[in-house]
Amino acid sequence: MDIKKIMKLPACGGCMAKLPPGMLKDVVSQIPVFNDPNLLVGFDTSDDGAVYKLSDDIAIIQTLDFFTPMVEDPYTFGKIAAANALSDVYAMGGRVAVALNIVCFPEEDDPAVLASILRGGAEKVMEAGGVLCGGHSINDRECKYGLSVTGVVHPDKYLRNNTCKKGDVIILTKPLGVGMIMASYRYGEVAEEDYQQALKSMQTLNKYAFEAASKFHLHAGTDVTGFGFLGHLNEMTNDDYTIAVESKGIKYIPGALKLAQEFLTTGGGQKNRNFLKGKVRFQNVPDAMQEVLLDPQTSGGMLLSVPANEAKELMKELNDLELPSCIIGEVQERQDANIIVY
């Protein structure tokens, strides 16, 4: 079987395949709003999933995510795609309950490749403590895979992405740069060490970061995916606050900055920059570092907003778990931009 043919890497694999945020905002604004007192979180905001109240003690989190391959190994692709889809449940403050496969695959190609993808995905659902209970498949010229995931949470304890409080510290739980690393690896522009670090990061469930963080007073949370670090951080401000970012403290895969310095960036990063025009102000931040902050991430880390007096202890717990986390900034009174990067 020709795995490389089946797993042909498209121009935009992983979360780089997302539609531009500006386009999505315009389209979603044309959808009728559904009014239901039990719908706690819908699509009227840019949260990571929907939350629907079933009883006084139980609400469900509903989310889905799928994309085209960003790696040639089908088993690894399955694990990354599943980890990415499962992440939204943790970003909403819940635990994974059940998942369904979403499959697009050419029927004339080797089913063993699809079996490897599904095995990788199933292992991640199992690691998350969830149950994989079926799915849906269609014949397609291009391979795509992901999950529809249902999580559970107490109706009073779900997380939003836009409920930061003044004085909060923001923590990032994975290094940035996987978008540029994956895009350039196919052209031989990336060191193997950086590539392996990107693969490890994308396969790591955000379950562990969330479980550590849930012991603290989390005010807001989200995960970093296709809209990049700054795009998702912008959603956290809700246009009410300004988040001051110290760029020198942000962790990234070393090779990503080198790629940016050589102008080997991604189209998705440029779309993110265009969308954030007027919302982000850079102060003496090198262009290459700006690109790292705008880079679309696949299965990226969590952004957690916590009280300043709890940040140090949370960082200790994350470090004890060997999660490459960092404090990236703080929530301040509203200034002339949603985000100011120093």
Where are these regions (language model features)?
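Glycine-rich anion-binding loops of enzyme active sites
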Residues: S55-V71, R95-V190, E330
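Active-site glycine-rich loop that binds ribose-phosphate moieties when present
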Residues: S148-K157, E192-A213, P286
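Glycine-/charge-enriched secondary-structure boundary and capping motifs
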Residues: D2-C12, M23-D26, E107-V131, N139-C143, ...
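A generic local secondary-structure boundary/capping motif
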Residues: L39-V41, G49-Y52, S87-Y90, A122, ...
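Small-aliphatic-rich amphipathic alpha-helix that forms the alpha element of a beta-alpha
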Residues: P74-L100, S116-E127, L205-H217, V224-E235
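Short pre-catalytic strand/loop immediately N-terminal to key active-site residues, enriched for Gly-Thr
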Residues: Y75, E193-S201, L218-A220, M289-V292
